[in-house]
Protein backbone atom coordinates (compact mmCIF):
# COMPACT_ATOMS: atom_id res chain seq x y z
CA UNK A 1 0.00 0.00 0.00
CA UNK A 2 1.14 3.55 -0.73
CA UNK A 3 2.13 5.42 2.41
CA UNK A 4 0.65 8.91 2.40
CA UNK A 5 1.36 10.22 5.92
CA UNK A 6 4.12 9.22 8.30
CA UNK A 7 4.32 10.45 11.89
CA UNK A 8 7.84 10.17 13.28
CA UNK A 9 8.48 10.40 17.04
CA UNK A 10 5.80 13.04 17.54
CA UNK A 11 5.74 14.80 20.89
CA UNK A 12 3.47 17.71 21.73
CA UNK A 13 3.60 19.59 25.01
CA UNK A 14 1.08 22.27 25.94
CA UNK A 15 2.31 25.19 28.02
CA UNK A 16 5.96 24.24 27.69
CA UNK A 17 8.14 26.23 30.09
CA UNK A 18 5.21 27.13 32.35
CA UNK A 19 3.85 25.61 35.58
CA UNK A 20 0.92 24.33 33.49
CA UNK A 21 3.13 22.23 31.18
CA UNK A 22 1.33 19.07 30.01
CA UNK A 23 2.45 16.43 27.54
CA UNK A 24 -0.46 15.43 25.26
CA UNK A 25 1.37 13.20 22.75
CA UNK A 26 4.63 11.42 23.57
CA UNK A 27 7.12 10.03 21.04
CA UNK A 28 4.39 8.60 18.80
CA UNK A 29 5.02 7.11 15.36
CA UNK A 30 2.55 5.75 12.81
CA UNK A 31 1.86 5.49 9.09
CA UNK A 32 -1.36 6.14 7.16
CA UNK A 33 -1.89 4.50 3.77
CA UNK A 34 -3.83 5.59 0.70
CA UNK A 35 -7.28 4.03 0.53
CA UNK A 36 -7.36 2.72 4.10
CA UNK A 37 -9.98 3.48 6.76
CA UNK A 38 -8.13 4.03 10.02
CA UNK A 39 -9.89 4.28 13.37
CA UNK A 40 -8.49 5.96 16.49
CA UNK A 41 -9.97 5.28 19.91
CA UNK A 42 -8.94 6.24 23.41
CA UNK A 43 -10.31 7.62 26.65
CA UNK A 44 -10.88 11.37 26.98
CA UNK A 45 -7.48 13.02 27.36
CA UNK A 46 -5.57 10.22 25.64
CA UNK A 47 -4.22 12.57 22.95
CA UNK A 48 -6.48 11.70 19.99
CA UNK A 49 -7.51 15.25 19.11
CA UNK A 50 -3.99 16.59 19.58
CA UNK A 51 -2.65 13.90 17.24
CA UNK A 52 -5.09 14.55 14.40
CA UNK A 53 -4.56 18.32 14.57
CA UNK A 54 -0.90 17.69 13.75
CA UNK A 55 -1.74 15.75 10.60
CA UNK A 56 -2.75 18.88 8.67
CA UNK A 57 -0.56 21.38 10.47
CA UNK A 58 -3.08 22.97 12.83
CA UNK A 59 -0.59 22.20 15.59
CA UNK A 60 3.20 22.24 15.27
CA UNK A 61 5.15 19.43 16.95
CA UNK A 62 7.21 20.15 20.03
CA UNK A 63 9.50 17.53 18.53
CA UNK A 64 9.24 14.92 15.79
CA UNK A 65 8.02 15.20 12.19
CA UNK A 66 4.88 14.82 10.10
CA UNK A 67 5.66 13.66 6.56
CA UNK A 68 3.10 14.07 3.77
CA UNK A 69 4.11 12.26 0.60
CA UNK A 70 7.58 11.88 2.10
CA UNK A 71 8.08 15.61 2.79
CA UNK A 72 8.14 17.28 6.21
CA UNK A 73 5.06 19.51 6.28
CA UNK A 74 6.93 22.08 8.40
CA UNK A 75 10.05 22.20 6.20
CA UNK A 76 8.61 25.35 4.63
CA UNK A 77 5.94 26.96 6.87
CA UNK A 78 4.78 29.09 3.92
CA UNK A 79 3.43 25.92 2.27
CA UNK A 80 1.37 24.73 5.24
CA UNK A 81 -1.77 26.13 3.57
CA UNK A 82 -1.35 23.61 0.75
CA UNK A 83 -1.05 20.80 3.29
CA UNK A 84 -4.51 21.70 4.59
CA UNK A 85 -5.94 21.35 1.09
CA UNK A 86 -4.55 17.81 0.89
CA UNK A 87 -5.42 16.76 4.44
CA UNK A 88 -8.98 17.73 5.32
CA UNK A 89 -10.05 17.86 8.96
CA UNK A 90 -13.69 17.81 10.05
CA UNK A 91 -14.02 18.81 13.69
CA UNK A 92 -16.61 17.45 16.08
CA UNK A 93 -19.92 19.31 15.56
CA UNK A 94 -18.59 20.99 12.38
CA UNK A 95 -22.00 22.52 11.68
CA UNK A 96 -21.08 25.29 14.13
CA UNK A 97 -18.44 26.43 11.61
CA UNK A 98 -20.94 27.21 8.83
CA UNK A 99 -20.97 30.91 8.08
CA UNK A 100 -21.82 31.75 4.45
CA UNK A 101 -25.13 33.07 3.07
CA UNK A 102 -25.92 29.86 1.18
CA UNK A 103 -24.95 26.20 1.43
CA UNK A 104 -23.41 26.47 -2.04
CA UNK A 105 -21.09 29.31 -1.00
CA UNK A 106 -20.13 27.52 2.19
CA UNK A 107 -19.11 24.37 0.31
CA UNK A 108 -17.35 26.51 -2.32
CA UNK A 109 -15.22 28.35 0.27
CA UNK A 110 -12.32 25.86 0.24
CA UNK A 111 -12.13 25.34 -3.55
CA UNK A 112 -12.35 29.12 -4.06
CA UNK A 113 -9.33 29.63 -1.81
CA UNK A 114 -7.49 27.02 -3.85
CA UNK A 115 -7.72 29.38 -6.83
CA UNK A 116 -9.78 27.03 -9.00
CA UNK A 117 -11.89 28.09 -11.99
CA UNK A 118 -15.61 28.77 -11.56
CA UNK A 119 -16.48 25.65 -13.56
CA UNK A 120 -14.21 23.48 -11.43
CA UNK A 121 -15.59 25.00 -8.23
CA UNK A 122 -19.13 24.31 -9.40
CA UNK A 123 -18.26 20.70 -10.23
CA UNK A 124 -16.67 20.16 -6.85
CA UNK A 125 -19.53 21.78 -4.93
CA UNK A 126 -22.14 19.60 -6.62
CA UNK A 127 -20.13 16.40 -6.42
CA UNK A 128 -19.23 16.89 -2.77
CA UNK A 129 -22.84 17.75 -1.94
CA UNK A 130 -23.85 14.50 -3.64
CA UNK A 131 -21.25 12.49 -1.68
CA UNK A 132 -22.47 14.09 1.55
CA UNK A 133 -26.11 13.28 0.76
CA UNK A 134 -27.32 16.83 0.02
CA UNK A 135 -29.82 17.43 -2.79
CA UNK A 136 -29.40 20.30 -5.28
CA UNK A 137 -32.42 22.17 -3.93
CA UNK A 138 -30.62 22.67 -0.59
CA UNK A 139 -27.61 24.42 -2.12
CA UNK A 140 -29.29 27.82 -2.41
CA UNK A 141 -30.72 27.72 1.11
CA UNK A 142 -29.13 29.39 4.09
CA UNK A 143 -27.08 26.81 6.02
CA UNK A 144 -28.81 28.05 9.16
CA UNK A 145 -32.17 26.92 7.75
CA UNK A 146 -31.03 23.30 7.56
CA UNK A 147 -31.72 20.55 10.05
CA UNK A 148 -28.92 19.43 12.34
CA UNK A 149 -28.12 16.43 10.17
CA UNK A 150 -28.15 18.52 6.99
CA UNK A 151 -25.78 21.05 8.57
CA UNK A 152 -23.39 18.21 9.42
CA UNK A 153 -23.53 17.05 5.80
CA UNK A 154 -22.90 20.57 4.49
CA UNK A 155 -19.86 20.95 6.73
CA UNK A 156 -18.44 17.60 5.62
CA UNK A 157 -19.13 18.53 1.97
CA UNK A 158 -17.10 21.71 2.45
CA UNK A 159 -14.04 19.62 3.32
CA UNK A 160 -14.68 16.95 0.67
CA UNK A 161 -14.92 19.71 -1.97
CA UNK A 162 -11.17 20.25 -1.63
CA UNK A 163 -10.76 16.59 -2.67
CA UNK A 164 -8.24 15.84 0.07
CA UNK A 165 -5.98 12.81 -0.12
CA UNK A 166 -6.67 12.27 3.58
CA UNK A 167 -10.03 12.93 5.24
CA UNK A 168 -9.91 13.16 9.04
CA UNK A 169 -13.13 13.14 11.04
CA UNK A 170 -13.45 13.77 14.78
CA UNK A 171 -16.65 12.09 16.03
CA UNK A 172 -18.51 12.65 12.72
CA UNK A 173 -21.76 11.05 13.94
CA UNK A 174 -21.95 12.66 17.41
CA UNK A 175 -25.46 13.79 18.26
CA UNK A 176 -27.14 12.15 15.25
CA UNK A 177 -29.92 9.55 15.38
CA UNK A 178 -29.11 5.96 14.26
CA UNK A 179 -30.37 6.48 10.71
CA UNK A 180 -28.40 9.71 10.40
CA UNK A 181 -25.24 8.06 11.72
CA UNK A 182 -25.39 5.19 9.24
CA UNK A 183 -26.17 7.54 6.37
CA UNK A 184 -23.18 9.80 7.16
CA UNK A 185 -20.86 6.79 7.42
CA UNK A 186 -22.08 5.46 4.08
CA UNK A 187 -21.37 8.85 2.48
CA UNK A 188 -17.85 8.79 3.92
CA UNK A 189 -17.26 5.26 2.61
CA UNK A 190 -18.55 6.31 -0.82
CA UNK A 191 -16.07 9.20 -0.92
CA UNK A 192 -13.23 6.95 0.18
CA UNK A 193 -14.00 4.40 -2.55
CA UNK A 194 -14.41 7.02 -5.30
CA UNK A 195 -11.26 9.00 -4.46
CA UNK A 196 -9.09 6.21 -3.02
CA UNK A 197 -8.60 8.60 -0.12
CA UNK A 198 -7.34 7.63 3.30
CA UNK A 199 -9.97 8.17 6.00
CA UNK A 200 -9.05 8.65 9.65
CA UNK A 201 -11.96 8.56 12.11
CA UNK A 202 -11.93 9.29 15.82
CA UNK A 203 -14.98 7.85 17.55
CA UNK A 204 -16.29 6.71 20.92
CA UNK A 205 -18.74 4.33 19.20
CA UNK A 206 -17.10 0.92 19.17
CA UNK A 207 -19.86 -0.46 16.93
CA UNK A 208 -19.14 2.19 14.28
CA UNK A 209 -15.41 1.57 14.55
CA UNK A 210 -15.81 -2.20 14.32
CA UNK A 211 -18.12 -1.99 11.31
CA UNK A 212 -16.14 0.51 9.24
CA UNK A 213 -12.40 0.63 9.82
CA UNK A 214 -9.66 -1.54 8.33
CA UNK A 215 -7.14 -0.79 11.06
CA UNK A 216 -7.44 0.53 14.59
CA UNK A 217 -5.11 2.47 16.88
CA UNK A 218 -5.75 2.58 20.62
CA UNK A 219 -4.27 5.60 22.42
CA UNK A 220 -3.56 5.99 26.12
CA UNK A 221 -1.53 8.71 27.85
CA UNK A 222 -0.42 10.26 24.60
CA UNK A 223 0.84 7.23 22.74
CA UNK A 224 -0.36 4.20 20.77
CA UNK A 225 -0.66 1.17 23.04
CA UNK A 226 -2.37 -1.16 20.58
CA UNK A 227 -2.61 -1.34 16.78
CA UNK A 228 -4.21 -3.89 14.50
CA UNK A 229 -7.33 -5.04 12.71
CA UNK A 230 -10.55 -4.51 14.72
CA UNK A 231 -10.85 -8.27 15.28
CA UNK A 232 -7.37 -8.32 16.80
CA UNK A 233 -7.81 -5.23 18.96
CA UNK A 234 -11.26 -6.12 20.29
CA UNK A 235 -10.05 -9.60 21.24
CA UNK A 236 -8.16 -7.78 24.04
CA UNK A 237 -11.42 -6.67 25.64
CA UNK A 238 -10.19 -6.86 29.23
CA UNK A 239 -7.26 -4.55 28.47
CA UNK A 240 -9.54 -2.08 26.70
CA UNK A 241 -11.94 -2.02 29.63
CA UNK A 242 -9.02 -1.40 32.01
CA UNK A 243 -8.28 1.74 29.94
CA UNK A 244 -11.83 2.97 30.45
CA UNK A 245 -12.98 1.94 26.97
CA UNK A 246 -15.97 -0.08 25.89
CA UNK A 247 -16.02 -2.91 23.37
CA UNK A 248 -18.79 -3.65 20.84
CA UNK A 249 -21.91 -5.17 22.42
CA UNK A 250 -21.52 -8.35 20.36
CA UNK A 251 -17.96 -8.74 21.61
CA UNK A 252 -19.20 -8.47 25.20
CA UNK A 253 -21.78 -11.20 24.56
CA UNK A 254 -19.27 -13.52 22.88
CA UNK A 255 -16.69 -13.02 25.62
CA UNK A 256 -19.28 -13.88 28.24
CA UNK A 257 -20.19 -17.03 26.31
CA UNK A 258 -16.52 -17.98 26.22
CA UNK A 259 -16.33 -17.52 29.99
CA UNK A 260 -19.27 -19.92 30.29
CA UNK A 261 -17.42 -22.52 28.24
CA UNK A 262 -19.20 -22.01 24.91
CA UNK A 263 -16.91 -22.42 21.89
CA UNK A 264 -17.26 -19.16 19.93
CA UNK A 265 -14.68 -17.43 17.70
CA UNK A 266 -12.62 -14.85 19.56
CA UNK A 267 -12.38 -12.72 16.42
CA UNK A 268 -16.12 -12.04 16.13
CA UNK A 269 -16.91 -8.46 17.12
CA UNK A 270 -20.00 -7.27 15.18
PLM regions with names:
Residues 56:
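Helix-to-loop junction immediately C-terminal to a conserved catalytic motif
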Residues 65-82:
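ABC ATPase NBD Q-loop/coupling interface
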Residues 120-137:
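Conserved ABC ATPase "signature" region
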Residues 142-146, 150:
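Conserved ABC ATPase signature
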Residues 163:
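Conserved catalytic motifs of ABC-family nucleotide-binding domains
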Residues 167-170:
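Catalytic Walker B motif of ABC-type/P-loop ATPase nucleotide-binding domains
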Residues 221-222:
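Conserved ABC ATPase "signature" C-loop
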Amino acid sequence: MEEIIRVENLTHTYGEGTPFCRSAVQDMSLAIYRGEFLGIIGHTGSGKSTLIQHLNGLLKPTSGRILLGGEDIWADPKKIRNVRFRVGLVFQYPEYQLFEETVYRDIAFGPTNMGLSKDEIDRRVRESAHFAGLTDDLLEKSPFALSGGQKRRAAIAGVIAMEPDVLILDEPTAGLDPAGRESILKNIRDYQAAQQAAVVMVSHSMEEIASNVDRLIVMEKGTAVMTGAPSEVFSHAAELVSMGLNVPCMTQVLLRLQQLGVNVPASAYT
